[in-house]
UniProtKB/Swiss-Prot annotation:
This is Uncharacterized MscS family protein YkuT. One of its GO terms (molecular function) is mechanosensitive monoatomic ion channel activity. Induction: Expression is sigma B-dependent. Induced by high salt concentrations. It is a multi-pass membrane protein. The gene is ykuT. May play a role in resistance to osmotic downshock. GO terms for cellular component: plasma membrane. Its main location: membrane. Belongs to the MscS (TC 1.A.23) family. The keyword Ribonucleoprotein does not apply. Disulfide bonds: none annotated. The keyword Aminoacyl-tRNA synthetase does not apply. The chain crosses the membrane at residues 13-33, 66-86, 101-123. The lineage of its organism: Bacteria, Bacillati, Bacillota, Bacilli, Bacillales.
Length: 267
């Protein structure tokens, strides 16, 4: 009881109060610096986009990575400052981390592999945010490239998180022009030259109407020859991600042209 009475409770409460105030200020500064840093990074990359220094997809990819690096670095600095506030030597922690690192090194190989692979993906410009890609059994639009994972959203809305180390083969469908391909089945008894002429007329009209078409469309010729029907192939080169739209328009216009050229007999 004498110990309790003699203990400097006022000093303890004062020191604890000062410590809590300092901690609150540090937390407040952390969120202020984080908010300002995020805004500055986003503003800088927006400027790059306006000046056409970077493509939109490339700018979004690098912005996402820069934001991740900034966030992780800021958390580390905040953690070290908190340790220092409680009079714990951060260097001792870092020295201990080296020993612990040896123990968990094998377990961390995957993390290191993710980061290194992600770095080379960005360095070699294999993909950008907004690209349509196929990775292994997944395909979709790249939403984010991070330090550890790449996020791909499939066309059904599913968001896939793929560890960067698993991205060994990438098929990027958003680089350069893409090919629109339409196969048209027609009865074998029809005059082939007449059918090709009608199809090419549709192709020429569609090319004039759609600026997304970069070359063609052109009737390549007979793709398959059967006893009751033949298949005629039409091919066009389009802007990336526009090939499906061009194919749909071609099918619609070809159907309309056939309806006009070969009206059904009325009873």
């Amino acid at each position: 009881m004498d110990f309790i009475k003699q203990y400097d409770w006022a000093g303890l409460i004062t020191n604890a109060g000062v410590l809590l105030i300092k901690l609150a200020i540090m937390i407040l500064l952390y969120f202020i610096v984080r908010s300002l840093g995020m805004k500055i990074i986003k503003h800088l990359f927006a400027k790059f986009e306006e000046q056409n220094s970077l493509s939109i997809g490339r700018a979004h990819t690098l912005r996402s990575l820069t934001l991740n690096i900034f966030a992780y670095t800021l958390i580390f600095i905040f953690f070290v400052m908190v340790l220092d506030l409680f009079h714990y030597d951060p260097s001792a922690l870092l020295a201990g981390a080296g020993i612990v690192g040896l123990a968990v090194g094998f377990g961390a190989q995957g993390l290191v592999s993710d980061i290194v692979t992600g770095f080379f993906i960005l360095l070699e410009k294999q993909l950008d945010v907004g690209d349509y890609i196929t990775v292994s059994t997944f395909d979709g639009i790249v939403e984010q490239v991070g330090l550890r994972t790449t996020q791909i959203r499939s066309f059904d809305g599913t968001l896939h998180y793929i560890p960067n180390r698993n991205i060994t083969n990438v098929s990027n469908h958003s680089r350069g022009t893409m090919q629109a391909l339409v196969d048209i089945k027609v009865p074998a008894e029809r005059n082939i030259d007449e059918m090709i002429h009608i199809l090419q007329q549709v192709c020429d009209e569609t090319a004039a109407a759609l600026p997304q078409i970069k070359e063609g469309p052109n009737v390549i010729g007979i793709q398959e020859l059967g006893t009751s029907e033949i298949v005629i192939r039409v091919i066009a080169k389009t802007e990336n991600m526009e090939q499906w739209r061009v194919e749909r328009v071609l099918r619609k216009e070809i159907k309309n042209a056939f309806d006009r050229a070969f009206p059904k007999e009325t009873e």
